[in-house]
Every structure is written in C-alpha cells, then in structure tokens.
C-alpha cells in the first residue's frame, strides 16, 4: 500500500479548513488507500524553524514510493525543504494552490523564501503536479504561472472554479493520485 501524506496549509485554522479537503478526498481513493494527515508544528503560526524540524522529520520518515499532497503554504514548505536538500523517496508530489515564495515575488519576504534558481535545487526526476483554481480568493493563480516558469518539468494545471479550498468535485485529484500510487 502506498503511503499518502497530506500537508495542510498555514495560518489560523488552516488544519481545520484543510481537513475538509482530506475528508472529501479520502472516500474517492478507495479502501486500499489512507491519507495520513498530521498537524505540522509551526505551519499555523508560520514559524519556519518549527515547520522545518517537524515537516522535515515527517518527510524523512516516509517509506519509499510515498505520495505527498500539500496545500497552500504547506505546499510551499515542502518545496522549500526539498530545495534545501531534503530527499524523501517520493513517487509523486502534488501541490495544491501554493504561493510562490521566491525572493522576487509577493510571498518572498519570509523565512519560507525559495532560492532564485529553484529547479536546480529540487530532486532530479521527482514528478510534480501543481493544481490551482482560477478563482482562488487567497493565493492568485498567477503563482502557478511562477511555478511553471521556475520548475518547467512540473505539470501545472489551472482548474476552473473551486477557490482556494478546491470546493466541489475532487475526482480529478483522486484519479491523479491513484494513477501514480
């Protein structure tokens, strides 16, 4: 059985909000797949040192061939850890509505900032799929375009509707996960 890890977003109540995504996604995956949804220390308070420690340990402990689904600031945190040298043995990384934390972006003045040459710091050959809603009310879909420019190997999909929490049908995500797990 493939290990599935869902990394929640950042800010107040992000874990609670993202639990809705997990609760809608889990039944679509079938009985053989279970999403692990730990509360990552530091994400809700946007404390990079705490996030780096807790999420770094969580990623390190994943079994080979795991799939990570990460949302919003949690997705950016996973990307930053990978850029800093974390090397979990992932089968696939799914990023949902992540802010682009480059030093040249609106999200860049934080401890979560990426190196300018982001793609050069990521694990070679790691399949990455990024989904963003065109009507995201929190993180503009223009962030997805930044990722596409900085990580051209990643598949970038702009979805019509659903907002930041991907309200509505999640079959697209379930099918993609089942296709790689």
Regions found by a protein language model. Give the residues of each.
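Catalytic histidine-centered segment of alpha/beta-hydrolase-like enzymes
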Residues: 45-46, 162-174
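Short beta-strand/loop motif that positions the catalytic acidic residue
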Residues: 124, 129-132, 136
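Gly/Ala-rich beta-loop-alpha elbow adjacent to hydrolase catalytic centers
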Residues: 69-79
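Catalytic active-site module of serine/aspartate enzymes centered on a nucleophile-bearing elbow/loop
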Residues: 58, 169-181
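Active-site catalytic motif of lipid deacylating hydrolases and related acyltransferases
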Residues: 2-63
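Short glycine-rich catalytic loops that host catalytic nucleophiles or stabilize transition states
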Residues: 37-41, 157-163
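A conserved short beta-strand
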Residues: 88-101
């Amino acid at each position: 059985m493939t290990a599935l890890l869902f990394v929640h977003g950042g800010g107040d109540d992000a874990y609670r909000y993202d639990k809705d995504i997990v609760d809608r996604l889990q039944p679509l995956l079938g009985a053989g797949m279970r999403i692990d949804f730990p509360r990552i220390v530091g994400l809700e308070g946007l404390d990079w040192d705490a996030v780096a420690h807790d999420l770094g340990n969580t990623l390190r402990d994943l079994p080979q061939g795991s799939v990570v689904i990460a949302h919003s600031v949690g997705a950016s945190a996973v990307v930053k850890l990978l850029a800093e040298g974390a090397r979990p043995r992932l089968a696939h990384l799914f990023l949902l509505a992540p802010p682009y934390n480059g030093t040249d972006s609106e999200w860049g003045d934080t401890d979560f900032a990426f190196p300018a040459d982001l793609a050069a710091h990521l694990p070679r050959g790691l399949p990455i799929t990024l989904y963003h809603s065109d009507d995201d009310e929190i993180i503009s879909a223009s962030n997805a375009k930044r990722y596409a420019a900085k990580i051209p190997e990643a598949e970038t999909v702009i979805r019509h509707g659903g907002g930041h929490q991907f309200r509505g049908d999640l079959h697209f995500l379930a099918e993609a996960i089942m296709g790689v797990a």
